A protein has these predicted regions:
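Short, well-ordered beta-strand segments
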Residues: 25-27, 72, 120, 165-167, ...
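Central regulatory/effector-binding core of bacterial HTH transcription factors
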Residues: 21-81, 232-235
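Acidic, Gly/Pro-rich loop/turn segments at junctions of secondary structure
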Residues: 47, 56-150
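Hydrophobic hinge/microswitch elements
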Residues: 141-186, 192-193, 208, 216
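Alpha-helical "hinge/linker" immediately C-terminal to small N-terminal DNA-binding modules
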Residues: 1-15
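Alpha-helical segments flanking ligand/cofactor-binding loops in enzyme cores
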Residues: 86, 112, 157-158, 213
């Protein structure tokens, strides 16, 4: 029996039927990586235990895919000269602040009230770009004059947790849980900041491996099933 147990323990682990092996190098903005991608990748690896993934998180978009990258996820409408672009959809945004900040500075009742508040944005609002808010067929533009300028949406939301202001580009996909836990308060819930378009980028001239194609399909399916994300049905 002891020898039989030894043979069982030393036998090679069989790969689950239909699973994928190999390695994938993927790059994504910090907010998408932490809020969405890491849980999805770990779920994908549980299905495919012999798959290795190298994930690099960055601040802001990329205009050129690095040669060592198999998949890049970009948000925003930025051109990328060496990529095949597959649209995923859009990330819905919301505005949030802490109870402490709102108690001290007041709760905005209209978009115009935001001009008297400290507004915390991401990389797409640091160079003088205004905040665009949508409600049905209405569109309002709010200028931003922030004392604290942050190039990352997650950092802006963290600053809001510490009473620094109103995070105006927080992604709904991972912020609603903080609202449900009463750590943040949804500001002007009838108004929604312009959504952020998101795409999968694949290098031109390189045939994607079966592992890359499978992970892209998995990400697209996860995107489709998340009610806080808008899926592009043309994918």
């Amino acid at each position: 029996p002891l020898l039989e147990r030894f043979h069982k323990l030393s036998a090679p682990v069989s790969r689950p039927e239909g699973s994928i092996s190999g390695s994938i190098r993927i790059s994504a903005p910090n907010a998408i990586g932490n809020g969405l991608l890491i849980p999805w990748i770990t779920a994908f690896q549980r299905r495919n235990p012999e798959l290795f993934v190298n994930l690099t998180l960055t601040l802001g978009p990329m205009h050129i895919i690095p040669p060592e990258c198999d998949i890049r996820i970009n948000h925003g409408l930025y051109p990328c000269s060496n990529a095949v672009i597959r649209k995923l959809g859009e990330m819905r945004r919301m505005m949030v602040a802490s109870a402490g900040y709102l108690a001290k500075h007041g709760v905005p009742k209209t978009p115009e009230d935001l001009e008297f508040h400290e507004l915390l944005g991401g990389n797409d609002l640091v160079n003088g770009a205004p905040l665009v808010l949508l409600k049905d067929n209405e569109r309002v533009i709010v200028p931003i004059h922030s004392k604290l300028r942050l190039k990352d949406h997650t950092a802006a939301r963290t600053a809001a947790l510490f009473d620094a202001g109103i995070s105006v580009h927080a992604f709904r996909s991972d912020t609603m849980e903080l609202v449900r836990r009463k750590l943040l308060i949804h500001v002007l819930p009838d108004w929604e900041p312009e959504p952020s378009p998101v795409s999968l980028l694949l290098p031109i001239g390189r045939k994607p491996s079966s592992a890359v194609e499978a992970l892209c399909d998995f990400i697209a399916e996860k995107w489709r099933s998340n009610p806080e994300l808008v899926f592009d049905h043309g994918l």
